[in-house]
Amino acid sequence: METNKEEDVTLSVVMPAYNEGTHITDNLLETSRVLSGFVKRYEIIAVDDGSADNTAECIHRAEMQDTHIRGISYQPNGGKGHAIRTGIAAAEGRYIAFLDSDLELPPILLKRFLKDMKEQNADIVIGSKLHPESKLHYPMLRKIMSYGYYLMLKMMFHLNTHDTQTGIKLFKKEVIKPIVSQMQAEGYAFDIEILAMAAKDGRKICEAPIELNYSRDDSKGGRRIGLKDVAKVFNETVEVKRRMHTHGR
C-alpha cells in the first residue's frame, strides 16, 4: 500500500502558455511525472494563450503521450489572466492550482502547498518570494520590481499577504470557481484581483516558501516582462481597485 500519495486528492493544475513551443512538451510531461509521485488522481490543463509559434501543436504532442494532460487553444492572445481563467473554468479537481509553464517554479512545490492547505485549513495557498524559507535565484531588477509592487499593493488593498504575483497558487475548488466567474482582469493583475476578492470574502490565505530559478533564455520564446508590461500592470491594478470600490468590495 502506498503511503506517499494524497489518497483523497483530486488536483487540477492549470498551466498557461504563450510562445512556449520550444519546451512546453517536455515541461508538461515533467510536471505529470512529478505529480504522479504524490497525487493519486490529477489532471494538467495546458492553455495556449493565442501563441504565434507551435505551442498548440506541442501541447497536443504531450496529450498524445500522457492522458493526464489536456490542452486548450484559442486565438487571439488574451493575456495570462484570461488563460488561467479559461483553465480554471475547465478544471474538475477538488483542488485547483495554477503554475507557470516555464517551470522556473518546480511542480514539486505543490506537495508542500497541499500539506499546508490541510494542516492550516486554508482556502488558498500562495507561493511567496518574501517567505523566510524561500530560495531565490533571479535578477536584482526583478527583485526590486517585485518589492515595489508589493508596497503599492499594501497601500491600495491592505492585504495581509506579502507576495501576490508568484506564478504558483493552490485553491479549493469551491472557493476559486465563484471568484473567477466574477473576475474581469485579463492580464498580470489577475492574481491581485483573485486575492483581493478572496480576502474581502473572508477566505483564509496562507503563504508557502518557493524555490525560484530564473533561467529563461529569451531566444527560446515565451514572454519577458518589459517596461510596457510594468505600465500595463499598474493600470490594471488601479482598475481592479476601482471596480472593487464601485461594487462595494
What do the predicted segments below correspond to?
Residues H68-A90, Y95, P107-Y188, Y214-F234, ...:
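Acceptor/aglycone-binding surface of glycosyltransferases and processive sugar-polymer synthases
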Residues E20-H23, S51, K80, P106:
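Donor nucleotide-sugar binding loop of glycosyltransferases
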Residues M1-R33:
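N-proximal low-complexity "stem/linker" segments adjacent to membrane-targeting elements
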Residues D48-E57, L103:
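A conserved acidic beta->alpha catalytic loop
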Residues T10-S12, E43, E193:
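Cell-envelope/extracellular polymer assembly enzymes that use nucleotide-activated donors
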Residues N160, E186, L195-N213:
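Catalytic donor-sugar/metal-binding loop of nucleotide-sugar-dependent glycosyltransferases
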Residues K40-S51, I72-Y74:
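Short beta-strand/loop segment that forms part of the nucleotide-sugar
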